[in-house]
Amino acid sequence: MVDQMRRAASSITANVAEGFGRQTYKEKVQFYYHSHGSLNELKNFLLIAKDIGYLNQKDFDALAEQANLKHKILQGFLQKTKSLINHNSLITRKNR
């Protein structure tokens, strides 16, 4: 389970980085969604680790709080990037 958690955690940041490097907003959103999925996977593993006794409640709470903060940050990336897609679509339509 530790390896799966490490892979999920590294996938979060890797997908955000790849999204930042993409040229179009639609591509960025795609990678931010992949990052979001990896974060949900990690949160699931945290719950399992707590339930089977690998994590005590205090450690789980601290890690869950960090995961929830990361979730809010990712949601911000997604909302802002989606708004830029919509904004560009409106500009393109006006220029036709």
Residue positions per predicted region:
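Short, C-terminally biased terminal segments at protein or domain edges
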Residues: 1-96
